Amino acid sequence: MNDLIKHKLELLPNNPGCYLHKDKFGNIIYVGKAKNLKNRVRSYFRGSHDTKTELLVSEIADFEFIVTESNIEALLLEINLIQENMPKFNIRLKDGKSYPFIKITKELYPRLLITRQVKKDGGLYFGPYPDAGAANEIKKLLDRIFPFKKCKNPANKVCFYYHIGQCKAHTICHTTEAYWQGLVEDVKNFLNGHDDKIVNQLKAKMKDMSDQMEFERAAEYRDLIEAVSTLRTKQRVIRQDMQDRDIFGYYVDKGWMCVQVFFVRQGKLIQRDVNMFPYYNDAEEDFLTYIGQFYLDSRHLKPKEIFIPGDIDQESVEALVGNEVKVFKPQRGEKKQLVNLAMKNARVSLTQKFDLLEKDIAKTQGAIENLGKLMGIPTPVRIESFDNSNIMGTSPVSAMVVFENGKPNKKEYRKYKIKTVEGPDDYASMREVIRRRYSRVKRDGLTPPDLIIMDGGQGQVNVAKDVLRNELNLSIPVAGLQKNDKHQTNELLFGDPLRVIDLPRQSEEFFLLHRIQDEVHRFAITFHRQVRSKNSFSSKLDGVEGLGPKRKQKLLKNFKSMTAIQQASVEDIQALGIPEKVAQALLDKLSQDSH
């Protein structure tokens, strides 16, 4: 068991949920569910196991988890994750056909059945469900509400279920084909999550029984209504409306923000994205900027719907994602619970990050010394790392972070706006930044770093070396951190010529480099968001006579967002020292731009 796993085991919550075991390459090799995540995941690394489990444990290099609200939700989520990732240690149940389904038969008088085989027989299939117990629980509820045919008796003979109101004897009750088709439609709507009609019918019957002093019958309908409500909660992870949607949640603490996105495809929660970064503005503004950049990434296709937390401005999100995406801010019910689940997982992820950092920092001194030995250089007490950030060449920036004795020294961090480069040219941008940084180090007699780490491969390293050696006559070791196709820290490049330094992925040295790369990447992205936000803000204020840079800055500082300015009065803007005529012209322009 490596140190990362040891640390993460200590931080597991006692909640139900799913866990995903990963190998040294970051591949998901097993998905499991648990009523108690802490107890279940810890059990893999304690005591003896059978041969199959021992083999699994031997390949586990890391794990992650998703917290759910109930064990049933964990069961449903487990199915989705297994079908999406097909981990090699899970039983591969292709197409979910070994799981139970609820079926409505295509007969003149349809029946409700449970089956494990999906056939092209014209029947309607709902599921899959995690186990027979879950399917039976739902079918029993359906049987109590919808009086489908439940027997194979001849037409002139009624069954037991007829006497308890759960079967319409097709001959005696003179039901028509239209009646049965209507019943089928009601069940389809019910299982697809549209149960308001049924609940209202049950409430009406409960009131009717109560008015007739039939209190036992009224209690039966009350119990049915409660059962429907419980079912609605238990089926939260598999939405029966088959809609594609992204569900956003976030959490902020200690100057950091964690954004958690649940990807729901065809009604099933199949994947999530977790991103953590320092934030420097208002939390809502940084969250909005994140959403805007999230869908600029070609890996993230826009869904049909987006759910956002209640404290986020809906109109701002709609402006960011465009008219083709519907944005919802759920206030109650199942959809609100999904957003709450994303918020809860964001909090768990960020809390875990802080706890892991505290544990890791204590071990970094030895990692620094070993890193120097592996690279053949003196112990790199001070490390400076660089990264660029831009979107298609717009608002290009770069950033530098400093680690001393394995700890970030934020007072030494530096931000750079690219001044001499036009368009998206990472190499030219980095050449400018390295020149500016180390010209100053040389000119002002500052202490140079023991190691420079570039967030990139051979090209970035060669650019830095060229500037240092041939322009500035400085001798500072330069290494590169290369990422894999999943955008994860993968290899350390160093030497002349460059070579891969062999670092075990679970070593403290690798964790240190990963933290450095993660920090410089987040710092650069956050700075880029700030610059783009200010540029966008400023451009919308252009063209108003009497509104210069200083007054724009006042507006930005006090109102934080364009939405806030649009909602302000002339008097609110005048309070900042802006003349009434200019304030009115500004509001008129913003009103025109919004139409």
Swiss-Prot record:
Keyword Amino-acid biosynthesis: no
Domain of life: Bacteria
Compartments reported by the entry: Cytoplasm
SMART domains for this protein: GIYc
Gene3D superfamilies: 5' to 3' exonuclease, C-terminal subdomain (1.10.150.20), GIY-YIG endonuclease (3.40.1440.10), UVR domain (4.10.860.10), UvrC, RNAse H endonuclease domain (3.30.420.340)
InterPro entries, A to Z: GIY-YIG_endonuc, GIY-YIG_endonuc_sf, GIY-YIG_UvrC_Cho, RuvA_2-like, UVR_dom, UVR_dom_sf, UvrABC_protein_C, UvrC
Keywords: Cytoplasm, DNA damage, DNA excision, DNA repair, Excision nuclease, SOS response
SUPFAM superfamilies linked to this entry: C-terminal UvrC-binding domain of UvrB (SSF46600), GIY-YIG endonuclease (SSF82771), RuvA domain 2-like (SSF47781)
GO molecular function: DNA binding; excinuclease ABC activity
Residues covered by the GIY-YIG domain: 14-91
Alphabetical GO biological process terms: nucleotide-excision repair; SOS response
Keyword Iron-sulfur attributed: no
Domain UVR: 196-231
Pfam families associated with the record: GIY-YIG (PF01541), HHH_5 (PF14520), UVR (PF02151), UvrC_RNaseH (PF22920), UvrC_RNaseH_dom (PF08459)
GO cellular component, one term: cytoplasm
CDD domains, alphabetized: GIY-YIG_UvrC_Cho
Function: The UvrABC repair system catalyzes the recognition and processing of DNA lesions. UvrC both incises the 5' and 3' sides of the lesion. The N-terminal half is responsible for the 3' incision and the C-terminal half is responsible for the 5' incision.
Subunit structure: Interacts with UvrB in an incision complex.
UniProt record similarity statement: Belongs to the UvrC family.
Protein name per UniProt: UvrABC system protein C
Organism field: Streptococcus thermophilus (strain ATCC BAA-250 / LMG 18311)
